[in-house]
Amino acid sequence: MRHRHFLKLFSAGAIVLSVLARPALANPVVVFDLKSGQILQHQDAFKRWYPASLSKLMTAYVTFRAIAAGEIQLDSPIKVTKHSAAEPPSKMGFKPGSVMRLDNALKMMLVKSANDIAMAVGENVGGSQAAFAERMNAEAVRLGMNGTHFVNPNGLYSPDQYTTARDLAVLVMAIRREFPQYAPWFSIEGLAVGKKAIPNYNLLIGRYPGADGMKTGFVCPSGFNMIGSATRNGRTLVAVVLGEKSAVSRAETAAKLLDQGFDAPVAGSTTVAILAPYGDTTSSNDMSDEICKKKKPHEQSEAPPAVAKDAPKSPYQEKLDHVPTLVAVGLGGATGPAPKAILDQGGQEYADVPIPTWRPDKPQPAGTGPKVAGADAQGDQSAKTAN
């Protein structure tokens, strides 16, 4: 990936924060070294928080483990049910009965943060939403995510779906260490579905030197959540940021924390695994009034500002300096075996069905949108947008 060094580096006399100097931040934060697990900064790491679409990281992790166990393959069919199709945005908008490959479904879930596709993945891998949530919770217990509970695979609000910044750090380490082959999916700049370009909601990707992941999340009670990662000189740092007030501010905070981490001469001695619980660990914070009350609909969206004048004037993030690389995804091409959970329920294998018509959230006028070269809907093909 081509990067321009957007970051204005701190001067030699700048103060470098560490675990001994707490950041002046309002909400939960954990910054850590991926390889060692050493924590560079943390604040309210055990505070219960609504994960929103960060839940999709656990959905991905459960699915990666199902692939490793032989329950499903990357080219296995994921069928959109009536239930999954009815999930609210952010969504792809495919009709019930639509079928896609699992790998394409996961990319839509991670890049577009599509709630309908996350639910479809959960239903197909687990057999039902409830059964998949049980698997999510079982993995959380196994990993030691003691402040976490899930009821759905997409992160739509429920008072019973919660996590902590520390637990999310544990999950990130499990994903990146156990399944490095999927790491490129977390740094995809955008998707191409036919002629439609879908950008990644993660404003670090392509805008912050070394950025390579991972996920954003938003519901009104949670505020704007983000897990951002970056690698420089072989060192990967991760920032977990919860409860920011906008898509822009969460990216700016994550970038600032990552930059402070890379500038730190050494990491702290405390690791994610041994960090002892502290503070309030039982009550959940609800930001609904602060984030969504008296806000216009577009201000409640997961998506960042769409127009240039709304772009932040920040030393940490700027516009892309290159044409985004899009990964082509779509329906069809599912030639692999049906998921084990579906077969166990007596379902029949469905593969390579006719491609249904794509129903976007908002119809696109004919002749508009970027042209996409090499936009094959199957597998890991990438394409460049052309003006």
Predicted segments with their positions:
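Bacterial N-terminal signal peptides that target proteins for export
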Residues: 1-11
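Short, positively charged
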Residues: 10-12, 34, 192, 208
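Active-site-adjacent loops and short helices of periplasmic peptidoglycan-processing enzymes
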Residues: 2, 16-166, 173-176
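Domain-terminus/edge residues, biased toward the C-terminal soluble/receptor-binding domains
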Residues: 146-149, 153, 157-162, 166-387
